[in-house]
Amino acid sequence: MTTQAPPTSLLPLSPEQLARLQAAVGEFSPTQMAWLSGYFWGMVNQQPGAVASPAVAAPPPVTVTLISASQTGNARRLAEQLRDDLLAAQLSVNLVNAGDYKFKQIAQERLLVVVASTQGEGEPAEEAVALHKFLFSKKAPKLSETAFAVFGLGDTSYEHFCQAGKDFDSKLAELGAQRLLDRVDADVEYQVQAQQWRQQVVATLQAKVPAQSTAPTQFIAPTQFIAPTQSTTPAAAAITSGGTTTVSPYSKTAPLTAQLSVQQKVTGRNSEKDVRHIEIDLGDSGLRYQPGDALGVWFDNDPALVEELLALLWLKGDEPVSIDGQNMPLAQALLSHLELTQNTTLIVDKYAALSRDETLIALLADKPALQLYAKNTPFVDMVRQAPSDLNADQLVGLLRPLTPRLYSIASSQAETENEVHITVGVVRYDIDGRARSGGASGYLADRLEVDGDIRVFIEHNDNFRLPANPETPVIMIGPGTGIAPFRAFMQQREVDGASGKNWLFFGNPHFTEDFLYQVEWQRYVKEGVLTRIDLAWSRDQAHKIYVQDKLREQGAELWNWIQQGAHIYVCGDANRMAKDVEQVLLDVVALHGAMDAEQADEYLSELRQARRYQRDVY
């Protein structure tokens, strides 16, 4: 149930034995698993010839259930670190992905720890949506026997900071569960907070269950070992063509230095959008990925932006500063280590205090206006509008660490081999007549030369996977750059010779300017690989048409596909498109399935739990 699979060579079981064991215990509750561990321990330690004497059975060890609700991998990595801490403290722990958690068993939990990230406008991570819905439904049980702790991960640049963590924390308490620790709300730079919290959790749980923490041996429940399968691959692992798992040396903190091989604009010259097709050569690195995964891209800020900021603050750039204990010139820190293109309300608040600018100070009292200002005004433009004389250390203290951007992978390695493709919408806008661009998208489109080095890593996404059965129909809904993973899906389905039907819904402003990968889709249709394609061009007529309108228009046939077992995939904008699409799906289910709104919502939740409704939204 964890996403951390140990090397097969370390296990005393063959893969076949491990698979049989997992099949046998797959439906066991944490309490049953704990009892089983004691049962096996007794079998191993029974002395030959000893006569069993009647005795009162020792109470089963209390298992800590650790739920990871991750969107971009941070919550998962933190949960894995905490699991390792708890095991080192000789506590019984069961780490489970929120999407795999059988939440109807939650009333049986005694010790529950949740690590939850937030996406979009306060939404839970995609894998945690079903659990979130259940807890906020009438079916949620009382949890008076449960003690819990919550760590929330978020981003202060968003209005609903750490909202998912807040939701889980408040709802668990409302259902009668007792807090082990106060909830933590962590920003992008969460590592120090997380380390302190992990130590507190271990100490608190050791005090709660002292008998286990002093046990002479460490037992690891079988549910913590998952055989390598397509849906349970650890973040640093990949599946080879032979089905075995290899551990990659590359990660977010240790990226691969690859080379840019292709950078091509795929929108027309008159398009309002600038979309680039990017191909990156992985060389002989052995870096592996699957359709549905994301590519993490580290980037440098625009040198011109760095120079502009230094000039505004009357700084030279050679001032010594420290970043994570590493000494370097200020200019280098601004170029490669600090975020310059994304502002936050917290940064505005701090800068207002330092600059004593009356306009900014007044803005702090108007929360909606403050949020809008932070969203639309990069740091350098805030400094231009409200000049100050920050020194180098004050500047570094204000800015957040630079973080990589994630892009849905637009290729299948079964076809492209040692390449990875992404589809990048370049962010461009003007502030006071000055052209600005996104940090990573501007780097990829404007500054990175072909054959230039680029640091990348794979962010595995086991919540966005093609069905295991190649005969299963697939419905893909991806307007704009949301089409990227479906290009990977179609490449994979074609290479596999999958016989299942494929249906694509795609939309963009104009047919002539914005039909991304048009020739490829036309070929798939001509060769029968793509069964159906429905296109929505929002600006080609007076009345705007979006993919959700096409879904509603095809409601009867959509329901037929769902009844045939189709898997539904949605990729793209989380705040508007994904919500509108979900509402249409609910309407289609209600109308053609003869259900009321509550039944339709439950039906869609069941599809989500069965991995038949998956979303990659941002």
Curated annotation (Swiss-Prot):
PROSITE patterns cross-referenced by the UniProt entry: FAD_FR, FLAVODOXIN_LIKE
Alphabetical list of InterPro entries matching this protein: CysJ, CysJ-like_FAD-binding, CysJ_Proteobact, FAD-bd_FR_type, Flavdoxin-like, Flavodoxin/NO_synth, Flavoprot_Pyr_Nucl_cyt_Rdtase, Flavoprotein-like_sf
The keyword Heme belongs to this UniProt entry's keyword annotation: no
Flavodoxin-like domain: residues covered: 64-202
Entry binding sites for FAD: 341, 375, 405-408, 423-425, 429, 438-441, 618
Pfam families (alphabetical): FAD_binding_1, Flavodoxin_1, NAD_binding_1
Alphabetized UniProt keyword annotations: Amino-acid biosynthesis, Cysteine biosynthesis, Electron transport, FAD, Flavoprotein, FMN, NADP, Oxidoreductase, Transport
One GO cellular component term noted in the UniProt record for this chain: cytosol
Pathway involvement of the protein, from the record: Sulfur metabolism; hydrogen sulfide biosynthesis; hydrogen sulfide from sulfite (NADPH route): step 1/1
Cofactor dependence: FAD; FMN
Enzyme Commission number(s): 1.8.1.2
Subunit field text: Alpha(8)-beta(8). The alpha component is a flavoprotein, the beta component is a hemoprotein.
Family, similarity comment: Belongs to the NADPH-dependent sulphite reductase flavoprotein subunit CysJ family.
Function: Component of the sulfite reductase complex that catalyzes the 6-electron reduction of sulfite to sulfide. This is one of several activities required for the biosynthesis of L-cysteine from sulfate. The flavoprotein component catalyzes the electron flow from NADPH -> FAD -> FMN to the hemoprotein component.
HAMAP family: CysJ (MF_01541)
Record's protein name: Sulfite reductase [NADPH] flavoprotein alpha-component
Lineage, opening ranks: Bacteria, Pseudomonadati, Pseudomonadota, Gammaproteobacteria, Enterobacterales
